[in-house]
Amino acid sequence: MSKKRVHELGKQLKEQGIELSNQELVEKLLHLGYDVKSHSSSLEDDQAHAAYEKILAERKPKAAPARPSGPGFVVRKRAHVEPPPVQEAQPVEAQPSYEEQPSYEEQPSYEEQPSLEEPAEVAAEAAPEPVEEPASSPEGGAPAGGAEPQPAPEAPPPSAAPAMPAAPSAPPSPAVRPPAPSVPAGAQPPGAPVRPAAPGVRPAAPGVRPAAPGVRPTGPGVRPSVPGGPRAPGQPTAPMAAAPHGPGAQPGQPAAPGPDPRTLRPTATQAVVISRPLVPVRRVTPPTGARTQFPAAPGPRALGEVRELKVVPGSLGREREFIDVSRDKRRGRTPGRPMSEEQAKSLSGKELLQAAITDRAYIPIRGKKKKPTKKGAKTQITEKAEHKKVIRVEESISVSELSQAMGVKASDLIRKLMQAGTMATINQQIDADTAAFLATEFGYTLEKKGFEVEEYIPEVEVDESKLVIRPPVVTVMGHVDHGKTSLLDAIRQADVAAGEAGGITQHIGAYAVQTPQGPITFLDTPGHEAFTAMRQRGAQVTDLVVLVVAADDGVMPQTVESIKAAKAAGVTILVAINKIDKPGATPERVMQQLTEYELVAEQWGGSTIMLPVSARTKQGIPELLEYIALQSEVLELKANPEMLASGRVIEAKLEKGRGPVATVLVEEGTLRVGDALVTGIHYGRVRAMMNERGEQVKEVPPGYPVEVLGLSGVPVAGDEFDVVQDEKAAKEVAEHRAEKQRKKELGASRKATLEDLFAKAKSGGGKVLNVVVKADVQGSSEAVTQALQKAATKKVGVKILDSGVGAITKSDVLTAAAGNGIIVGFNTKPESEIESIASQQGVKILLFDIIYEAVDKIREEMAGLLEPIIREKPLGKAEVRALFSIPKLGNIAGSAVTEGVIKRAANVRVLRDRKVVYSGKIGSLKRLKDDVREVQTGFECGIGIEGFSDVKPGDVIEAYELEEIRQSLD
């Protein structure tokens, strides 16, 4: 049930002419017993209606109630005419007589009305029109209108009868509009416009309200039409209504109480009940046809036409209903929609303003979105056009991004990858080839976009006319201590090996040597097992490999590794059997061992050149150089010096005062000072170049090594370098490569396998040695890192926190302190004040210049992480023979040593009936009265046990000691 607020009730009362302020209305409602607090309080509809009726009954003027009528009754206006003199009413039985009523004076009207000749005929014409009426009549079931009107008998005029008081006012019927003061029908000429009164009511004189239904009007020569025929004899006649105050009232005529109707505001129809008929009143049905409109009579302002209002649902939903009061539909417009130009021209300014207000009130508001129903036609799947089924990606793309681009579920893509044998997650990066495979499976085409390195580093076609002969690049490889560097010293006529730590080479050395056969570039690689990556890089950039094998040692593991690296690079191998001057040298045994690796000497019918040489006596060195020159001629080594330079990084390091220094080998073009180059994720401009002798050079032709200064960082050994147009282009290429590397690292996800978990469980609870590695050159740092990682065992692992080149800095110390690790420096030293900072942070710094010494020391540190094994070592036994009680010491067990030795402060166990009753330590050990350190077998002594006095004869005391045994890494 809906509610109504107090201020809305006040507005409704105001429409009925009752002016009440909000405070007065609240006090009135409280007086009537309603629980309200302010003008915003709410009342139920039935409560509001009851309060409205009560207040209206108290404040409205008393008037005779109009005859109740059904819904749809319309009270029309009546024309004002001259009232004829009213006849005096005849006295009625059992009722008081009425006073004689004087005739009304002629009243001004809107139109001149002709006098009526035959009042009886006019009365018949002035009958009310047929209007819908409820099924049940308030008069006690009077039949519906449509019966023929019957003339009523004329009542005799009353003689000086007192006026009858007006009946109490009844509530107005909401379906009836208040009419203007009407005139008797007998005073209107035929055809004059007359507004009919309520059904069954004859109008009275001008200025008099119509009587209640069934009231008999008076007038000269006018008989009321009474349903049911003439009145029966003896039936009392209805009294005449008193004339109201106002124009046309006769002097001395009694008037009904109440205010002047002209001062009232338009309200619902009100009437004064004079009397009710004793017989049912039938409604008169006028003849069908067009009605004649009559001018309205003077009097109170009449209400406008009756409008039929429509109940519409609210635009905001919430199951509310509102009354549509819009007038736009009468003008052919829809509320809330734009007005056409023609309609706007036809309206006045005031109407346009009203229309604008109405349109503003009808702004359409979107309601709740309806859920799609399952009914209807089947959804049609549309296919994309071919030009829209193209996906553009860069080097890599994640599975989720690819699924969004294709409009395919990520689970479907992962399923396809699993079917192809690739495990991937939704956020994992996949390369362009894998993305192209998935795109093809779902009908899409993949195109690469973004940065193209070829735009900055284009491939240049080889111009045969500009090619010149370049020197060969020869890499010397072999096992450690087989004389590789000594052989190069003999060729260069230098003594490099004597200056190397431990007499071994630990990074690549590049040298350009002038020989009688021409210039040759030699690369000296380390032979230690830790420098595998260096040997592989040397094999990739070389034209010829000289494999050095000691005649007294034979083929060793690194010899085999060098053979495999050279074959993998597709490089020609030339074997130099060194140290033939030493006693016990057997070159034939070496040649026999090499045949197992498909290296057969020419002397034995093979294709491999094998020469016996001696670095000490320089035996066989000229023949070696001749064979190198012969092989270079066979290979036809040529290059174009006019191209932009390109090549490979042989070694890189970070020197104090010089910055990043890279040793590069120029393979194509000519490298000049000032060139902008890029290598890996680093770039820069060549600031200076130096050869192997430390001399600065301005340009380097192809086939020669050189040290380059001016890079933004330390490059990775083995990376290619290229010269580009300017430094800006070099920076863009380097940044693109760095971004690509970052995405690759993020996409690579390493998951722990069961083997990793078992290995961690077997490693003593996951003991790990954290290490920070710093070296002089990038290759050495890489070699040390790999060597330390290989030193890890099942019990203790090795984790490299960081690795780099250059001096040990404060940042390295803080990194090691955060990871509770150590710092390993190889061929480098810490900066000033770094040792004191490391001591404060509790970080150990280990410095080495020989790699195998570094590995041995790291293994010791790893073993120190393992907890020692506690082992029990038996000492001896003693049997308790007697007990002695000594003050402050308690019971002393007089015992005889039966086995081994009993030492003071040794751990003991007391056994009684072969069961341990106590374990502790010896507190005192005496021989007679002297304290002794130990007692041997066969002697008696007194033994005092700490915290135990319940010793009994026959107990056995076992003495033992605990010793710690350091665990082994194996």
From Swiss-Prot:
Subcellular location(s): the record lists: Cytoplasm
Q: Where is this region: G4?
A: 578-581
Q: What would you give as a GO molecular function for this chain, any one?
A: GTP binding
User: According to the UniProt record, where is the region G2?
Assistant: 503-507
Report the InterPro entries cross-referenced here. Answer: EF-G-like_DII, IF2_II, IF2_N, P-loop_NTPase, Small_GTP-bd, T_Tr_GTP-bd_dom, TF_IF2_bacterial-like, TIF_IF2
Instruction: State any GO CC term.
Output: cytosol
Region labeled G5 — which residues? Answer: 614-616
* Gene3D superfamilies in alphabetical order: 1.10.10.2480, P-loop containing nucleotide triphosphate hydrolases (3.40.50.300), Translation factors (2.40.30.10), Translation initiation factor IF- 2, domain 3 (3.40.50.10050)
Q: Any idea which UniProt keywords this protein has?
A: Cytoplasm, GTP-binding, Initiation factor, Nucleotide-binding, Protein biosynthesis
**Coiled-coil annotation: which residues?**
none
Primary residence: cytoplasm
**Biased composition range(s): Polar residues:** 98-112
Region of interest called G3, as start-end residue ranges on this chain:
524-527
Q: Which residues bind GTP?
A: 478-485, 524-528, 578-581
Q: Which CDD domains match?
A: IF2_eIF5B, IF2_mtIF2_II, mtIF2_IVc
Q: Where is the composition biased (Pro residues)?
A: 150-160, 168-182
Q: Where is this region: Disordered?
A: 54-270, 328-348
G1: annotated span: 478-485
What protein family is recorded? Answer: Belongs to the TRAFAC class translation factor GTPase superfamily. Classic translation factor GTPase family. IF-2 subfamily.
> What PANTHER family would the database entry show?
TR-TYPE G DOMAIN-CONTAINING PROTEIN, TRANSLATION INITIATION FACTOR IF-2-RELATED
Q: What's the stated role of this polypeptide?
A: One of the essential components for the initiation of protein synthesis. Protects formylmethionyl-tRNA from spontaneous hydrolysis and promotes its binding to the 30S ribosomal subunits. Also involved in the hydrolysis of GTP during the formation of the 70S ribosomal complex.
Name the UniProt record assigns to this protein: Translation initiation factor IF-2
